[in-house]
Each structure stands twice: as structure tokens, then as C-alpha cells.
């Protein structure tokens, strides 16, 4: 903790990096190296300065770590979008939310599949029972007179006086 907050330590590391970089720079083939080195120096300084500042800010402001992490992730995502990247940084909380959502959807799908399979099994059993009932009866045992309502039908010889009772009769009405 002392090394993280010690400004002298940070300055000595920066001085060491700069002296190392200047010795490397004497080579004429390293034209773009100073730009890379300056970016690395700035990043290292930001890293060393942000950790103690973040710890002090968390203790004094009493805001949660998740809020600060969310703010930092949002800032980095905005910077990535400005730079033209389509990728985004996600936190563990977002990943856990997404996995929970996927697991919930998978459970719902499994319940749906279970319901559908039980319905299909019931339908197959019903079809089997219908098939068994159809296969048990022989065709010549079925009395078709019940099916076409011909049980009480009389033939021409059985009609009274030989007249067809279904023929229309003349009806006269008084006016």
C-alpha cells in the first residue's frame, strides 16, 4: 500500500523508464518508438495514480465498488465506440445476468418439450386404444341395420292394404 501511494516511487519508475527509452532511442531504426514509449508512460502513470485515488474515493465517498466499476466500464465502452470498435467490455455481473437469462430460457424450453412429449405419448396411447378396438371386432359381426336406421323398415308385402305409407296424399282444405 505504501508503494502504491508513494509519489516518489512512481516518479522513480517513470525516470527509470525514460532513461531506458532514451538509451534505446539512439538506434536510428526506432523512429516510432518515442510515440509508443510516451503512450506507455502515460498509461503506467494513470494506472499507478488511479489505484490509490480509487481506494481513497471509495473509502471517503462510501459508494460501492460496483457503481465505480460500472462507471469505468461505461467510460471505456464509450471510448471504444468513439474509436470505432464494435466490441464492448462486459463486467462479471452482466455475464452472470446473461447466463441466468439463458439458463431460464433453457429451463422454459425443457418444460415445453416435456409437456409436448407427454401430450404426444397420450396421443399415441389413445391411437393404440382406438386401433385395438377396431382390430378386435370382425366385420361380419357388426349389425349395420342400426347404423342406417333400417330396423323398422317394412317391405311392400308387409304394408297394410298394399299401400305405401310414404306416398303423398291429396289434402283439401276449406276456404
From Swiss-Prot:
Membrane-crossing residue ranges in chain numbering: 29-51
Family classification: Belongs to the rotavirus NSP4 family.
GO biological process, one term: symbiont-mediated activation of host autophagy
Lumenal-side positions: 1-28
Name assigned to this protein: Non-structural glycoprotein 4
Organism: Rotavirus A (strain RVA/Cow/United States/WC3/1981/G6P7[5])
Domain of life: Viruses
Role noted for this protein: Plays an essential role in the virus replication cycle by acting as a viroporin. Creates a pore in the host endoplasmic reticulum and as a consequence releases Ca(2+) in the cytoplasm of infected cell. In turn, high levels of cytoplasmic calcium trigger membrane trafficking and transport of viral ER-associated proteins to viroplasms, sites of viral genome replication and immature particle assembly. The secreted form acts as an enterotoxin that causes phospholipase C-dependent elevation of the intracellular calcium concentration in host intestinal mucosa cells. Increased concentration of intracellular calcium disrupts the cytoskeleton and the tight junctions, raising the paracellular permeability. Potentiates chloride ion secretion through a calcium ion-dependent signaling pathway, inducing age-dependent diarrhea.
List of glycosylated residues: 8, 18
Signal peptide: none
Main location group: host cell
Amino acid at each position: 500500500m505504501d508503494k502504491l501511494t508513494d509519489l516518489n516511487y512512481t516518479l522513480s519508475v517513470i525516470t527509470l523508464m525514460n532513461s531506458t527509452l532514451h538509451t534505446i532511442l539512439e538506434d536510428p531504426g526506432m523512429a516510432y518508438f518515442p510515440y509508443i514509449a510516451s503512450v506507455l508512460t502515460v498509461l503506467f502513470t494513470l494506472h499507478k495514480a488511479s489505484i490509490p485515488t480509487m481506494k481513497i474515493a471509495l473509502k471517503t465517498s462510501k459508494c460501492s465498488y460496483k457503481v465505480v466499476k460500472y462507471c469505468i466500464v461505461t467510460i471505456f465502452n464509450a471510448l471504444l465506440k468513439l474509436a470505432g470498435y464494435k466490441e464492448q467490455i462486459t463486467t462479471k455481473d452482466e455475464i452472470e445476468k446473461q447466463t441466468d437469462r439463458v439458463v431460464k430460457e433453457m429451463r422454459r424450453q425443457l418444460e415445453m418439450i416435456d409437456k409436448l412429449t407427454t401430450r404426444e405419448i397420450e396421443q399415441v396411447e389413445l391411437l393404440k386404444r382406438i386401433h385395438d378396438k377396431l382390430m378386435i371386432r370382425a366385420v361380419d359381426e357388426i349389425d349395420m341395420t342400426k347404423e342406417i336406421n333400417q330396423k323398422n323398415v317394412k317391405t311392400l308385402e308387409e304394408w297394410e292394404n298394399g299401400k305405401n305409407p310414404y306416398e303423398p296424399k291429396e289434402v283439401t282444405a276449406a276456404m
